[in-house]
Amino acid sequence: MKQVVVATKNMGKVREFAELFERFDLEVKSLHDFPHIEEVEETGETFEENAILKADSLSRQLNAIVIADDSGLIVDALNGKPGVYSARFAGEPKDDQANIDKVLQELNDVAFEKRKARFYCALAVAFPEGDKKPVIVNGTCEGFILEQRRGENGFGYDPIFYVEEYKKAMAELSSDEKNAISHRGRALRKLEEKIPEWFLGE
């Protein structure tokens, strides 16, 4: 079975990748399977830069195909924040609930119709062969920021992200519903079209 390493210790992300790739004969591993490897510091100024940085560095260290994503929440009324700082918007250590609280606080006096936002995902795949350039794709999911949390599913900002298509918060969606419209799901479907056949095991 072919193997790919997902460059994260976030088990929510790992589950999404595993579910989206389960129809392929592909074993998905995460950084939890390689405890000696340190996570790459995200020093890029864009989601794409961070994704390539992580995928490339870890692919060389592990001599493996590595998928890295950098994703986050972009809120128009906050001039694009939290953006590339989404995971640590409220500071270190990373804390989903504190990040949500900070977004809600900063949008406190903003009317719902002006709380437009989107989830953005940049996905990079790096190969151990030096002559193969990383593959990069992206996906977005449009929505609005709710005034309070809803739902128990998902992770990150899902409880405050309202998806008009379903009239629900992202955290109220089933895995299948989320994968159909999520930024990561859309990016992965683009990836399927770009990845060489030997990677997908078809």
From Swiss-Prot:
The keyword Hydrolase applies. One of its GO terms (molecular function) is dITP diphosphatase activity. Its EC number is 3.6.1.66. One of its GO terms (cellular component) is cytosol. The active site is at D70. CDD domains: HAM1 (cd00515). Signal peptide: none annotated. Substrate binds at T8, K9, N10, M11, G12, K13, S71, F155, G156, Y157, D158, K178, H183, R184. Pyrophosphatase that catalyzes the hydrolysis of nucleoside triphosphates to their monophosphate derivatives, with a high preference for the non-canonical purine nucleotides XTP (xanthosine triphosphate), dITP (deoxyinosine triphosphate) and ITP. Seems to function as a house-cleaning enzyme that removes non-canonical purine nucleotides from the nucleotide pool, thus preventing their incorporation into DNA/RNA and avoiding chromosomal lesions. Belongs to the HAM1 NTPase family. PANTHER family: INOSINE TRIPHOSPHATE PYROPHOSPHATASE, INOSINE TRIPHOSPHATE PYROPHOSPHATASE/HAM1 PROTEIN. This is dITP/XTP pyrophosphatase. It comes from Bacillus cereus (strain ATCC 10987 / NRS 248).
